[in-house]
């Protein structure tokens, strides 16, 4: 009998969202969004679930529902930086697996969270694990808001990009620049899923790593790890996860799912 990989789930949550203010505290069926996310992390089997925020109201909401919460600085440029502060404060062992569960994804699949943690444990040469799924629609391949990842033979990330990678010269070149005429990909193209598992030793070193030119160009923070020589293992799933909440329309859609009688 195999035992699940032990891991810690950290949920970075900040109130200062420009498109949806006070997002972590938005009501979903009588509970704040951040609590719904924490419940998913607990269902995934995390040994410890921590809500990390710079807002006392978010910490209070988590604690009121029985979850641990830790106050972090307000000036973090990314969720990874917030995780790094938490990892340093708790002094976890180097090989501790820490999963960053986004605070605006109350519908995230607990199985995916658990599987990404296990995927990192199964790849000792990697500092990070994440996930991706196949893209079947040409429009997604050419959409810069859809982040693509190119993989090596061991499904370790070679590069993440908003551009269409890999570029199929024979399939795409005859139609360029008419994106609407592009055929569906006849080879594997993968969309990155923004769920990460980290080794604690990497999180402690992350704040000291200089930003990478490719990170700044693409506006993708995972490129900093690749730039500095770290390896990222990628778990391939068959389908896309439920979308997170970024806008009032997203919130209304998810709130409807938490109404009594909804399925």
UniProtKB/Swiss-Prot annotation:
Q: Kindly state which keywords UniProt assigns to this record, in alphabetical order.
A: Cytoplasm, Lipopolysaccharide biosynthesis, Nucleotidyltransferase, Transferase
Q: Where in the cell is it found?
A: Cytoplasm
Enzyme Commission no: 2.7.7.38
| Pathway membership | Nucleotide-sugar biosynthesis; CMP-3-deoxy-D-manno-octulosonate biosynthesis; CMP-3-deoxy-D-manno-octulosonate from 3-deoxy-D-manno-octulosonate and CTP: step 1/1; Bacterial outer membrane biogenesis; lipopolysaccharide biosynthesis
For this chain's UniProt record, which GO biological process terms are given? CMP-keto-3-deoxy-D-manno-octulosonic acid biosynthetic process; lipopolysaccharide biosynthetic process
**Name of the protein:** 3-deoxy-manno-octulosonate cytidylyltransferase
InterPro entries tied to this protein: Cytidylyl_trans, KdsB, Nucleotide-diphossugar_trans
Instruction: List, alphabetically, the GO terms of the cellular component aspect.
Output: cytosol
Q: Which family does it belong to?
A: Belongs to the KdsB family.
Please list the coiled coil stretches: none
Class in the EC hierarchy, top level: transferase
From the UniProt record, report the name of the gene that encodes this protein: kdsB
> What Gene3D superfamilies is this protein classified in?
Spore Coat Polysaccharide Biosynthesis Protein SpsA, Chain A (3.90.550.10)
Q: Does the keyword Cytoplasm apply?
A: yes
Q: Which organism is it from?
A: Burkholderia cenocepacia (strain ATCC BAA-245 / DSM 16553 / LMG 16656 / NCTC 13227 / J2315 / CF5610) (Burkholderia cepacia (strain J2315))
Q: Which Pfam families match?
A: CTP_transf_3
